[in-house]
């Protein structure tokens, strides 16, 4: 590790200014080395702070080097609130070589890490004594040093001891060398006490949504080992041990904690959350475990019933297939006397163009649709159609269908259109000629012709000949 000479005070000043700017950026503090500074000799308005540190020395005569962990550093501090300025005087006491006859005092060399730690401790004292700030339990930062130093302190060659300020006196707990960490071999002989915590059973008799906090329960003064049949969950952990000296490793005892919890049973489904009850801790047990740290966990599955939720799919009944029936009335009125004779209709099924383009259209099986039983003959009193009735102008009827509406699947549409209605007695002749006759006269009324043909066969023959002549001429 790189070491700095105390004679080069720029390193000390640089670190000190950085620390002060972090806590008091608007105040000005100055660090002044003073070789004539004496401990416990203070001027009015000044306070003192002293600390021991580790340093290395080099003899200027024989070039011999040595290290010491009893190097005394003294600080005198003063703060002027009116001027917003502060001053710190510092002195590091030196040592001399014990091999030379009349050696001079050598300047100590302090490592960079220890310089930072010493000035941090000084900053705490400034906040506490000058600004009346800080915490009551604010401790000093321990310093780093070589723990392999052996032998007593050479007080005959120590500057502080020669002046009467012996550095061997305890100046604070932070100046003691830090203890080395525990080695694996030295921790085997340490025995740890065992602490057992037992929790009682917790049961639930009815559903509830309450949350219960831990309750205190009594524990026997001497806890015995739990039986194997009892369900339990035991956890044993070993916290890290604090640094100890090699001489005190044998007597070190580490605590050991064992937590035992019983089952949580429920007779009915419940949303109640219960926590194990707290219990008193027994510092002594009958059977301690092994010396090595361990973590053991033993658990038994809980008997709490589980609720299974199965999501059922929604079954929707199939929609009935709608039937669209459009029946156009005859443009000519029908007398009441002829209503009984109208039993059969020679229909001509013509499907609207909009329905033909639909993929759900089912064509009718026959163009002829016989009259159903739901036919109601008109009464004797004829009621003419109202003004709201609009007769169709074309033989093809187009049913307006909204673009946003589509027929559901399996939809059957049937369109009926009645042609000219003829009496039942005229069915023999109309079946042969009426359809062609209507096409020639562009669906004009052929009632007179049908009446004539119904009177005599000769009249029918005459009309047939006339029809052929007209067909030939046209």
From Swiss-Prot:
The keyword Ion transport does not apply. One of its GO terms (cellular component) is membrane. Residues 175-304 are annotated as: Disordered. It is found in: Membrane. Expressed predominantly in the liver. Not detected in the olfactory epithelium. A zinc finger (3CxxC-type) spans 53-164. One of its GO terms (molecular function) is zinc ion binding. It holds the Pfam family Zn_ribbon_3CxxC. InterPro entries: R-trans_p, ZAR1/RTP1-5-like_Znf-3CxxC. Residues 1-453 are cytoplasmic. Its main location: membrane. The keyword Transmembrane applies. Residues 197-228, 259-304 have a biased composition (Polar residues). Interacts with TAS2R16. Belongs to the TMEM7 family. Promotes functional cell surface expression of the bitter taste receptors TAS2R16 and TAS2R43. This is Receptor-transporting protein 3. The gene is Rtp3.
